[in-house]
Amino acid sequence: MGKTLAEKVWDAHVVRKGEGEGANAQPDLLFIDLHLIHEVTSPQAFEGLRLAGRPLRRVDLTIATEDHNTPTLDIDKPIADLTSRTQIETLRANCKEFGVRLHSLGDKEQGIVHVVGPQLGLTQPGMTVVCGDSHTSTHGAFGALAMGIGTSEVEHVMATQTLSLKPFKTMAINVEGTLRPGVTAKDIILAVIAKIGTGGGQGYVLEYRGSAIRALSMDARMTICNMSIEAGARAGMVAPDQTTYDYMQGRPHAPEGADWDAAVEYWNTLTTDADATFDVEVDLDADTLEPFVTWGTNPGQGVSLSAKVPSPEDFGDENAKAAAERALQYMGLEAGTPMKDIRVDTVFLGSCTNSRIEDLRVAADIIRGRAKDPNVRMLVVPGSARVRLEAEAEGLDKVFKEFGAEWRFAGCSMCLGMNPDQLEPGERCASTSNRNFEGRQGKGGRTHLVSPVVAAATAVRGTLSSPSDLEPAAAGALTGIAV
């Protein structure tokens, strides 16, 4: 019997096989190739090592960055919020004590951990990657088995470079066809989550497959894998191919010379075998997919942008009906309202889902030469200092500034509102982030998850919009990048 991609990577990392079978099976012990850390989930883990008198076992496989609490304005000044400042200072002290490489605020490689890892070439096919962060699944776009872990597991990896886990089930997400202009990777994953639900992937590793996935860039594949957790999955993966290798080659930590050739030879084996069997398969037609947007308070509460706000009566399940009623109340929406009639106050372009260079390029293409709706505030927050510098070298910052957007420094920013970038109560935001939970972007804030394409068009019109809703002269020179 053949193996899936996830099974191949798993089996290659088993240090000790758990005893027993089926429901009585004990966890396997897996070796971890890359451990990424940040300021929020690492302090207790470092303290655990300190109290036990243990060293950090593999400093060479551990890298830290500051992202969740970092300000995106005035980064040369002391952090005003005491909690945020304490977490940043604690990370710096811990990394210095234990010898961990840290990219601090102001460093040219600082940024969101799930942007920094890939851009440095640290994330590679066939790896096991962990981080104390839900959206570690981002790295699965490279054919890595990448998952978020809790603080106690962070300490375990620090101490042993291993993790005890039971094997997951496997689910294939088959996306065939060709995306239409203005439809992106973000729309694919929002449609997948709407289809299987926020718990549909629980206990599974998702493998994204099919012609539509193969046609995507690495930035776009990272967008899809990033939100696997929003479907309840532990991880999401895409098999590596030439697109992967073209992205990786020449990056600081990528193999070189003969090592590169040997690595690619191995990476080419990391595909699901023809005779492998998935536990579940889900199909999505890319040809018919439209821009997607959420209307409620979880990522599964989404519809096509051309649709209307659903009614609780549209849901047969009583729990889903009750959830819809609560979501509509919190979001201040009425059933039957066209999604395109919903006016927003803020547009946020950023987060580990959509803050890479292609995301910024496609948004800039749409707004170039246009005027922002005067009642809309737009924040553009690059995912890393490197992305920011690259965007500035291309003149994208000037496009955003001329449009009236705020051009910020790198960080998680308004995705989760742990720094000053927050919504006011009742404020409505079109956001390229990954979660639209109640209060996620600020107490009482209302979040609609969208693609960078929809975010840009929305900033122009002031209501949830796609580029096709703009006047021909306002559509910009779309690059065709599927982000």
From Swiss-Prot:
Its protein name is: 3-isopropylmalate dehydratase large subunit
Gene Ontology molecular function = 3-isopropylmalate dehydratase activity; 4 iron, 4 sulfur cluster binding; metal ion binding
Q: In which pathway does it act?
A: Amino-acid biosynthesis; L-leucine biosynthesis; L-leucine from 3-methyl-2-oxobutanoate: step 2/4
Q: Which cofactor does it need?
A: [4Fe-4S] cluster
> Which keywords describe this protein according to UniProt?
4Fe-4S, Amino-acid biosynthesis, Branched-chain amino acid biosynthesis, Iron, Iron-sulfur, Leucine biosynthesis, Lyase, Metal-binding
What is this enzyme's EC? 4.2.1.33
Briefly state the protein's biological role. Catalyzes the isomerization between 2-isopropylmalate and 3-isopropylmalate, via the formation of 2-isopropylmaleate.
Transmembrane region positions?
Answer: none
Disulfides per UniProt: none
According to its UniProt entry, one GO biological process term is: L-leucine biosynthetic process
Could you tell me what the cofactor note in this record states? Binds 1 [4Fe-4S] cluster per subunit.
Chemical reaction(s) catalysed = (2R,3S)-3-isopropylmalate = (2S)-2-isopropylmalate
Q: What class of enzyme is it?
A: lyase
- List residues binding [4Fe-4S] cluster: C352, C412, C415
The keyword Iron appears for this protein: yes
